[in-house]
Swiss-Prot record:
One of its GO terms (molecular function) is RNA binding. Residues 1-17, 59-70, 116-134, 272-281 have a biased composition (Basic and acidic residues). This is Woronin body major protein hexA. It comes from Aspergillus fumigatus (strain ATCC MYA-4609 / CBS 101355 / FGSC A1100 / Af293) (Neosartorya fumigata). Transmembrane segments: none annotated. Major component of Woronin bodies, fungal-specific organelles that occlude septal pores in order to separate intact from damaged compartments. HexA binds directly or indirectly to the Woronin body tether that in turn is anchored at the rim of the septal pore. Woronin bodies are important for stress resistance and virulence. CDD domains: S1_Hex1. Forms oligomers. Self-assembles into hexagonal rods. Binds directly or indirectly to the Woronin body tether lah.
Length: 537
């Protein structure tokens, strides 16, 4: 290797080498000034970063907040307050000490003035814990001594006065337990004295009697009950004198002084002794007033006469109407129905037959036009499109030609003349009846296939198609229907040499010859024909 001695020497290069390494490929010496580390100065201080890992143990850890953000401050001075509770316990022992006449008084003082060393929150939780513990102990003691304390009645009177006093903490705890014990006993023994059950039942029964009596008096005017008398209180011999009193009870002229029948005697309490003598004296007077038995029979007949009076108390029938002077009943409901019938059907009422006929004639008459002193009537027949829907079909007038078949006046006719009115646009057709050979004439009617379209229309017959099986010399044919029935001797219309045309088509034999037949009340007539070739069969 070649070694070249450096020409550049600087003071800042403490670790500079005197020789330089040559490149392996070029074999050219590389100067030291190319690298920036060669320009460092000894006067520039160097900074060294050192990372030290250690473990720090704190006295107390916090699970809620960070250790470096926890602060502590002394609590403010608690307020100085105090309470004095004076509990006076009065106990009477009836079972164990019946001869004891004196009362025991016990005064308990409680002072809660000095609580400087306690925190309010801690004291509150401690007080609640003590209260729950004391309640559990009291419940246990009560279960053990419930038989011994059944006759004791405990009354407590507490007077609270706000005045701070000094006392030890042990006295405060003892007074707190005694106070809780006294309060617990007072709450349990307060509801022990109950009223006697017979008094409560008697009051309840009396209230039920009053309620029933008031309700029956409102619903039944003939009901009246005198609670001062009961049949179970009367002697046995008063039963004879009690029968006429029943008749006076149902009579219309009653008075409150009379003896009434008690329907709820089983629920009424017994009256006082002073009222018993009064009721007996009245019963003796009633016995003297009825000397003989026929008077009771007359009273019984009087009861029968007054029986229809009870039907008046029944609710009347809910009828909507009135009675006239002749005693005939007229219903308001039927009158309303008749009024509605007159409004909806003004021409069908039984009092206006002549009006109905005049209106119908005016409707069928149609418009009237006078021309050159001649009165022309145009009759419009609207219901024709709906009368024979199964036997006819509507045909527009611009499709009808002379020789076609139409229904004129309800008869199948062949058209021989057509006339059109330039003013109204109606078509008038004249035709010959195919069965009776009579002339029929009729005008077209207006149909509305769409709301804004008006078309002059006529009715045409519905044709039946029969298969021709044979031809006869008398001008009749034998045909078969679509259901397979065979029709014998069907006549053919004579106009237009139709029979000759059918015979020519049938003799050619190029297809099936079909006859078009119209029906008129069971009579059939062949009016046309058509040939269906073999390709269509």
């Amino acid at each position: 290797m070649y070694s070249v001695e450096s020409k550049f020497e600087r003071d800042s290069r403490r670790d500079a080498q005197r020789t330089a390494n040559l490149d392996f490929d070029a074999r050219v010496p590389i100067p030291f000034s190319v690298f920036p580390s060669s320009y460092r100065s000894d006067a520039v201080p160097e900074t060294t970063l050192t990372r030290v890992e250690g473990e720090v143990n704190l006295d107390r850890t916090s699970h809620v907040e960070r250790e470096d953000t926890r602060t502590s401050a002394p609590l403010p001075d608690p307020r100085v307050y105090g309470r004095e509770e004076v509990d006076i316990h009065i106990s009477k022992d009836r079972l164990h000490a019946p001869s004891r006449k004196g009362d025991d008084f016990q005064v308990i003082y409680e002072d809660r003035a000095h609580k400087d060393s306690r925190v309010p929150e801690v004291e509150l939780s401690r007080e609640r814990w003590k209260r729950s513990e004391n309640n559990a102990k009291q419940n246990k003691n009560k279960n053990n001594t419930s038989t011994r304390r059944s006759g004791d009645v405990l009354k407590a009177v507490s007077a609270k006065k706000v005045a701070p006093q000094a006392q030890t903490r042990a006295d405060e705890k003892a007074s707190y337990q005694l106070t809780q014990k006294a309060r617990y006993r007072e709450s349990t023994s307060r509801y022990e004295p109950l009223p006697p059950k017979p008094v409560y039942d008697q009051a309840l029964e009396s209230q039920l009697d009053i309620t029933e009596r008031e309700y029956r008096r409102r619903t039944d005017p003939t009901y009246d009950v005198n609670l001062s008398y009961g049949r179970h209180q009367a002697p046995v011999d008063s039963y004879q004198a009690y029968q006429p009193q029943q008749t006076s009870d149902v009579s219309l002229h009653r008075s409150k002084t009379e003896i009434d029948v008690s329907y709820d005697k089983a629920y009424t309490p017994k009256p006082l002794e002073t009222r018993k003598g009064d009721s007996f004296s009245r019963s003796e007077l009633t016995v003297e007033s009825v000397p003989s038995r026929p008077s009771s029979a007359s009273s019984i007949s009087q009861v029968k006469v007054l029986k229809p009076y009870t039907a008046i108390d029944q609710p009347p029938a809910r009828k909507m109407g009135y009675y006239d002077d002749d005693g005939n009943y007229h219903s308001f409901r039927r009158g309303v129905e008749r009024a509605v019938d007159r409004i909806t059907h003004p021409f069908h009422h039984h009092h206006h037959h002549h009006d109905r006929e005049e209106v119908v004639i005016a409707d069928e008459r149609g418009p009237v036009r006078y021309r050159d002193g001649v009165r022309e009537d145009v009759r419009i027949v609207e219901p024709r499109a709906s009368k024979t829907t199964a036997e006819s079909v509507p045909i527009p007038c611009h499709f009808i030609r002379i020789g076609d078949i139409l229904i004129l006046q309800g008869r199948p006719c062949q058209v021989i003349r057509i006339s059109v009115s330039p003013q109204t646009g109606q078509h008038r057709y004249l035709g010959v009846d195919l069965f009776t050979r009579q002339l029929q004439e009729e005008s077209s009617f207006v149909s509305n296939p769409s709301p804004s379209v008006v078309v002059q229309t006529m009715l045409g017959p519905v044709y039946k198609t029969y298969r021709i099986l044979d031809l006869h010399e008398d001008g009749t044919i034998t045909a078969m229907t679509e259901t397979g029935d065979v029709k014998q001797a069907l006549p053919v219309v004579t106009q237009g040499q139709l029979f000759r045309k059918i015979r020519d088509a049938f003799s050619e034999g190029r297809g099936s010859v079909r006859a078009l037949v119209i029906n008129d009340g069971g009579r059939e007539l062949v009016v046309d024909y058509k040939v269906i070739h073999g390709s269509r069969l």
